[in-house]
Regions:
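Non-catalytic interface/linker regions that flank or bridge core catalytic/transmembrane domains
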Residues: 1-64
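Active-site metal-coordination segments of metallo-dependent hydrolases
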Residues: 66-76, 128-140
């Protein structure tokens, strides 16, 4: 294998983070190892719908047209989140572990954390580019999760997912986010950390900085 880091590969140079199937398989391996015997079906569907959303094949949506917050960034971030979750589960006592259901929710939230940049065909017809939503895109992502999770059979996760997605932005003061279970707050911090790690570990991070708001 070449010693040079490839532009669209993760920090280990082993997973092509521009390829949804490659990232899905890597996340599946981590999830199955961390939570043996747990179904990956809903996560498989979430990856499928994520790819459709960002490529313009999800009903009612135009696809991703922002230069920086694209499919590759989200896949890179979701892989980082899955690795953080796996490491966290190994490092804490059993009562403090997130568990499979909460980990699943965190991964799905990661997949759609930038869905607020995607324009809807009718609701957003007055906008010409997803970058116009930058200042409030996380709230739009939360709205997308509120609509999407029940379709996936995960209505129970709506309340938490629509809050912890805000750990990827600045629209809410994180110190003021209150959730009943501290493990949900941990998920939020892991998601926010994964978002930052994925950005800074990107092989082309410096080159992409000028594109971050377009």
């Amino acid at each position: 294998m070449s010693q040079d880091r490839r532009n669209d590969y993760d920090v280990t140079n082993t997973v092509q983070v521009s390829n949804p199937v490659a990232v899905r398989n890597a996340v599946n391996a981590l999830f199955s190892e961390t939570f043996p015997g747990t179904s990956f079906d809903k996560l498989w569907l979430a990856f499928y719908d994520f790819e459709r959303l960002f490529t313009g094949r999800y009903p009612g949506y135009k696809g991703c047209d922002t230069t920086y917050h694209d499919l590759q960034h989200t896949l890179d971030m979701t892989l980082a989140l899955a690795r953080l979750v796996a490491g966290y589960e190994r490092s804490v006592e059993p009562p403090d572990r997130l568990g499979a259901a909460r980990a699943q929710m965190a991964i799905i939230t990661s997949l759609f954390h930038d869905s607020g940049y995607i324009r809807h065909e009718t609701r957003d017809r007055d906008f010409t580019n997803g970058a116009e939503f930058t200042l409030y895109h996380v709230s739009r992502s939360a709205d997308f999760l509120r609509r999407y999770l029940p379709e996936l059979g995960l209505a129970r996760d709506v309340g938490v997912a629509s809050m912890i997605v805000h750990f990827t932005g600045y629209e809410l003061d994180l110190d003021h986010i209150e959730l009943d279970d501290p493990r949900d707050i941990i998920c939020g911090h892991l998601i926010g950390t994964a978002d930052m790690i994925a950005q800074m570990a990107d092989r082309c991070y410096l080159e992409k900085l000028s594109l971050i708001h377009i």
